[in-house]
Amino acid sequence: MTIERTFSIVKPDAVKRNLIGAIYRRIEKTGMQIVAAKMLRLTKEQAEGFYAEHEGKEFFDELVAYMMSGPVMVQVLEGENAVVRYRELMGKTNPEEAACGSLRADYAISMRYNSVHGADSPESAAREIAYFFAEDEICPRPVE
């Protein structure tokens, strides 16, 4: 059993539609635990820094503006194979291609307003977690 951490964002469109609780319930239903969470309003510098790998791409400016358009929830998830399991729960980036019952199939408005973000690898998860959380802000919970 490989217990790992992953990083997740509930994006502005989902926060605006009061979907935080519904998304958290779905995460916890999979057996993963939310071990850190906070609500933020991203600055331009934070959004650009977080999505720096996309700088220069045609969608970069729109993505940054979208992520600054309202509050987001950032959280650290922990569980067995958390990166892969959370990506499966999210579904494909394009909600029209996302599996029925996935977060994006159920909650996304469009490919641009796709409600959630998740790290794509354990390495990305570690980098993204460190971008928003100090280690002492993460509170592992015992598995019962």
From Swiss-Prot:
Keywords: ATP-binding, Cytoplasm, Kinase, Magnesium, Metal-binding, Nucleotide metabolism, Nucleotide-binding, Phosphoprotein, Transferase
Pfam families, A to Z: NDK
Molecular functions per Gene Ontology: ATP binding; metal ion binding; nucleoside diphosphate kinase activity
Binding site for ATP: 11, 59, 87, 93, 104, 114
SUPFAM superfamilies according to UniProt: Nucleoside diphosphate kinase, NDK
One GO location term (cellular component): cytoplasm
Location in or out of the cell: Cytoplasm
The organism's place on the tree of life at top rank: Bacteria
SMART domains membership: NDK
Entry cofactors: Mg(2+)
EC class (word): transferase
Active-site feature positions: 117
Signal peptide positions (record): none
GO BP field: CTP biosynthetic process; GTP biosynthetic process; UTP biosynthetic process
UniProt key word Metal-binding: yes
HAMAP family to which the protein is assigned, alphabetical: NDP_kinase
The family this protein is said to belong to: Belongs to the NDK family.
Subunit structure: Homotetramer.
Function: Major role in the synthesis of nucleoside triphosphates other than ATP. The ATP gamma phosphate is transferred to the NDP beta phosphate via a ping-pong mechanism, using a phosphorylated active-site intermediate.
Record protein name field: Nucleoside diphosphate kinase
The organism of origin for this protein: Aliivibrio fischeri (strain MJ11)
